[in-house]
Amino acid sequence: MPRAYTVATAALTLDVSAKWIDNALSHHRIKGVRQERQGVSRQLTIEGLLTLSIARMLSAELGSSVGNAISIAQRIIAERGKMMLTKGLQIELDLESFREQLLSRLEHAVEVAPLPRRGRPPRNTTGRLE
């Protein structure tokens, strides 16, 4: 099973808010994202991060909606960086270079991203011993 990363780590890697990622994951199915029942935090694999990173770039550069950008990003990944459209239009991305840049940013984000606290907060929050 490939390693998975938290939404906070993904947000730092992609330089977006955690809310942007949560919204994208809530409204769209993305390969490489583990989503379970309510109360279980989402986790993203490298493939999920790559899809979101390409989608973010397409959305920012071309003004595409996030949903369309995710769909195009998944096709680009499936077709190894080249996507042929009708009437000769082609979208090409140096996928290996893009992935290497993503992994470099991810490496930094893993070091600084906070680990999410799960469960009920501690009962004694004043620091006093009882």
Segments the model singles out, each with a brief description of its role:
Residues 33-57:
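Short helix-start
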Residues 1-2, 56-130:
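Basic Lys/Arg-rich amphipathic helical interaction modules
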Residues 1-24:
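Polyanion-binding surface elements
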Residues 16-42, 76:
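Major-groove DNA-recognition helix of helix-turn-helix-type DNA-binding domains
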